[in-house]
């Protein structure tokens, strides 16, 4: 039995670890040993928080870049909401739900250091958020304007801006990525001009886990143009403590399900001055101020961009998740997950026909192929041994083309993964390779 002793209820790190009858004072432990003990705490707290691990049919889940598992706090709060009556912003009897709903905006504001809680707009996910920006800016764009995207982008960015450009006549420029998978900064500088109206940037790749130097890229954009900047933070939100005001991005989009929240909920946030430029994508209830036979005026932000009945259960559940996440040592949890992924990369290098597509930084993502072996065949055999990973194009065909591959395999780790998961993966991998080679 492992028991964790907290000296104060508000403390996030334990002062003591108790193994059976043995008490270990953490302030008396140094270096690697202390780190291992903290990681034991992370594993235990992580796995206890997720009911998935109590299932008899639970597989080895190594697909966290696709979506994270759901903690009990989310399930409990969502069930509690559905057991009660009411919507939000509608009448007096739903006042408690409305308070929690709006508290979630404040939580998101504080989590990403947004400018104002009114700059937090609920969407169905990152894709919806990006489309909200694209559609909202379209009336301002014309054939003289240019939009910059990159080979590093997810289709949610890449396709959306291509289609937007078609509709308004604007020109698309696709920035190349270098052999280290970072955006070519010289190409960015060359592409920027007074015609550049928007630059869409991918913060962290869902393919290789590569983190772009977003702050430096935005500084270059500010220096060489007056363009608006949109950051796709879908993969960054669960790994990086984002400070939106420090980044100086105009728009930032992410999905709740990437950070232990519910499916079907996302966030668009950014500068109020930038968000105020957006024309609504949808029209209807809640997004209006006054309506008469011949005149309609829209509500202020954020409501003017949130037409219709929102995902109330999702928002309130996400509020509980963010409150729960405040109790984590975010940096230690991330370092632990990275350590698992990096150990896998080291071991995969020992396989003669394995090729890795590593990011220049340590990350929780492992992207690889085996020469002469079909990725789908290998994935199928791993799946049959209860290993859940991702195979395919990862909604990033231009990125895969840059890698020179049609498909790749991807593992992605979270703090609830264990060394036992790693061993199970390699046991399954060796069996699969014996059948395929």
Curated annotation (Swiss-Prot):
Q: Which InterPro entries match?
A: Aminotrans_V_dom, Cys_dSase_SufS, Cysteine_dSase, PyrdxlP-dep_Trfase, PyrdxlP-dep_Trfase_major, PyrdxlP-dep_Trfase_small
- Residue numbers carrying N6-(pyridoxal phosphate)lysine: 258
Q: Required co-factor?
A: pyridoxal 5'-phosphate
SUPFAM superfamilies the UniProt entry points to: PLP-dependent transferases (SSF53383)
Enzyme class label = transferase
GO molecular function ontology, one term from the record = cysteine desulfurase activity
Q: What is its EC number?
A: 2.8.1.7
For this entry, list what GO says about its biological process: cysteine metabolic process
List the catalytic activities from the record: (sulfur carrier)-H + L-cysteine = (sulfur carrier)-SH + L-alanine
Q: What UniProt keywords are attached to this protein's entry?
A: Pyridoxal phosphate, Transferase
Reported function = Catalyzes the removal of elemental sulfur and selenium atoms from L-cysteine, L-cystine, L-selenocysteine, and L-selenocystine to produce L-alanine.
Q: Which family does it belong to?
A: Belongs to the class-V pyridoxal-phosphate-dependent aminotransferase family. Csd subfamily.
Q: Could you tell me what this protein is called?
A: Probable cysteine desulfurase
Natural source organism: Haemophilus influenzae (strain ATCC 51907 / DSM 11121 / KW20 / Rd)
């Amino acid at each position: 039995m492992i028991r964790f002793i907290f000296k104060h209820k508000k403390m996030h790190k334990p002062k003591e670890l108790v193994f059976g009858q043995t008490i270990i004072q953490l302030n008396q432990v140094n270096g690697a040993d202390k780190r291992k003990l903290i990681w034991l705490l992370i594993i235990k707290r992580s796995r206890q928080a997720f009911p998935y691990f109590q299932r008899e049919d639970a597989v080895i889940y190594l697909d966290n870049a696709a979506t994270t598992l759901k903690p009990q706090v989310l399930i409990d709060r969502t069930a509690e909401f559905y057991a009660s009556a009411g919507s939000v912003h509608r009448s007096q009897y739903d006042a408690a739900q409305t308070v929690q709903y709006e508290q979630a905006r404040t939580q998101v504001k504080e989590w990403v250091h947004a400018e104002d809680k009114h700059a937090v707009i609920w969407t169905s996910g990152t894709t919806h958020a990006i489309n909200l920006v694209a559609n909202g800016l379209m009336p301002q764009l014309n054939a003289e304007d240019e939009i910059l995207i990159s080979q590093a982008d997810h289709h949610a960015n890449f396709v959306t801006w291509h289609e937007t450009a078609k509709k308004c006549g604007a020109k698309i420029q696709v920035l190349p990525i270098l052999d280290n998978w970072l955006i070519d900064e010289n190409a960015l500088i060359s592409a920027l001009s007074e015609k550049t109206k928007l630059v869409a940037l991918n913060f962290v790749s869902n393919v290789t886990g590569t983190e772009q130097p977003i702050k430096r890229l935005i500084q270059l954009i500010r220096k060489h143009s007056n363009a608006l900047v949109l950051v796709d933070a879908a993969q960054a939100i669960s790994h990086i403590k984002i400070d939106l005001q420090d980044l100086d991005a105009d728009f930032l989009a992410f999905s709740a399900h990437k950070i232990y929240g519910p499916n079907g909920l996302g966030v668009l946030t950014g500068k109020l001055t930038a968000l105020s430029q957006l024309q609504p994508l949808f029209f209807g209830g809640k997004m209006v101020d006054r309506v008469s036979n011949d005149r309609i005026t829209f509500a202020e932000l954020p409501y003017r961009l949130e037409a219709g009945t929102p995902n109330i259960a999702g928002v309130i559940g996400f509020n509980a998740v963010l409150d729960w996440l405040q109790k984590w040592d975010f940096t230690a949890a991330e370092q632990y997950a990275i350590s698992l992924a990096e150990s896998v990369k080291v071991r995969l290098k020992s396989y003669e026909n394995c090729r890795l597509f590593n990011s220049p930084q340590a990350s929780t993502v492992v992207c690889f192929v085996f020469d002469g072996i079909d990725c789908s065949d290998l994935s199928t055999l791993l799946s049959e041994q209860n290993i859940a990973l991702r195979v395919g194009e990862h909604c990033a065909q231009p990125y895969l083309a840059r890698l020179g591959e049609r498909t790749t395999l991807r593992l992605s780790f979270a703090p609830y993964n264990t060394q036992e998961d790693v061993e199970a993966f390699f046991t399954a991998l060796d069996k699969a390779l014996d059948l395929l080679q």
